Amino acid sequence: MLVLASNLIDFPILSIHVGGEITRTARAIVDPEDLSIIAFELVGGIVSDPEIGNFLMVEDIREYGDDGFIVDSADVFVEAQDVIRLNKILKLNFNLRGLKVVTKTKKKIGKVVDYTVDSNTFSVYQLVVQRPLMQSFVDPQLTINRSQITEIDDYSVTIDHDKEEIKLTDSSKDEEFVPNFVNPFRKPNYAGQEEESSVSDNSSKTSE
């Protein structure tokens, strides 16, 4: 499913080992080569301990849910220098938000203010672009599909067409995710218990 990247910041990290929240995300680390989130920098909680890494690689996330990212334990956290690819991207100081969006003819479309991400692959799916002031009266915000992107540098994103007029749809909202393991943080469904209780009450009344 698609989620706004901004919703993944200050997002809880839940540990199966501890049974609750142990830290939170501070920012997403995006690889400009393939436009995907490869890791999240963490802040607060258990990562305040200098002996514990402060980055979470996306491959170590067991599940994404409304309550947060679920991991096995803090043992999966790493330091930047421990992962060559992560260290290399951090040195680029790349930030997708704030980049100008222009056409091949250098016509300015706007500025990236957010983006949507596939929660399964963490690939960037769409750019949310704020239009310039004079154009925002008609199109205050546009979304650009990644297929329209032809080039990215430190300052701008170049797209194939003048604009891709696609508004954010319901697909960018949270959808139910079916995990491949039992989620200990998910609230149990007591519907079955309520039904059993109702049957029991009716049986008692009948016997009386």
Regions found by a protein language model. Give the residues of each.
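Peripheral interaction segments used for macromolecular assembly
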Residues: 1-208
